[in-house]
A protein has these predicted regions:
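Short amphipathic alpha-helix used as the core "switch/output" element in two-component signaling
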Residues: 69-83, 92
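Active-site residues of response regulator receiver
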Residues: 62-63
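Two-component/phosphorelay signaling modules centered on CheY-like receiver
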Residues: 20-39
Length: 142
């Protein structure tokens, strides 16, 4: 820790989002905040392939992906590889608690997205989040 700042445990993020504007905004916000966006994909097969390739600290996934893809399949792949997933979606699926660390409901702004990632990181480390943005539900450590 240097000057009160913790080293981030979440550095490399995969974005699975089929809405181009949302995907672009998320990618831009994360990069500006110092995260490495491993990839931005819009389909289940592309997300699963990236997850299987390793070196991802967090997946941000919409539930509805292109070609009728289901983000819950992305969540299952992430879970199988030990990678936490945060759903970023308009409606949190009923089975989300079994698949993900949490849900951030759309619409959300860049500050809320970054605060949600910080809250996920705190939760994974066993700490209480400093701030929970509106629309964020966390399933571990609730």
């Amino acid at each position: 820790m240097l000057f009160g700042k913790r080293e981030r445990a979440i550095k490399r993020v995969l974005i699975a989002e089929d809405e181009p504007l949302v995907a672009f905004d998320n990618e831009h916000s994360l990069r500006d905040a110092g995260y490495m966006v491993v990839a931005t994909v819009d389909s289940v097969p592309a997300a699963v392939a990236r997850i299987a390739g390793g070196r991802i600290d967090l997946v941000l996934s919409d539930v509805n992906l292109s070609d009728g893809g289901d983000g819950r399949d992305v969540a299952r792949a992430a879970k199988a590889h030990g990678v936490p997933l945060l759903f970023v979606t308009g409606a949190c699926p009923a089975d989300a608690r079994a698949l993900a660390i949490g849900c951030l409901l759309k619409p959300y702004g860049p500050r809320d997205l970054l605060a949600a990632i910080e809250a996920v990181e705190a939760t994974l480390a066993g700490r209480a989040p400093r701030r929970r943005p509106r629309g964020l539900m966390l399933f571990d450590g609730d």
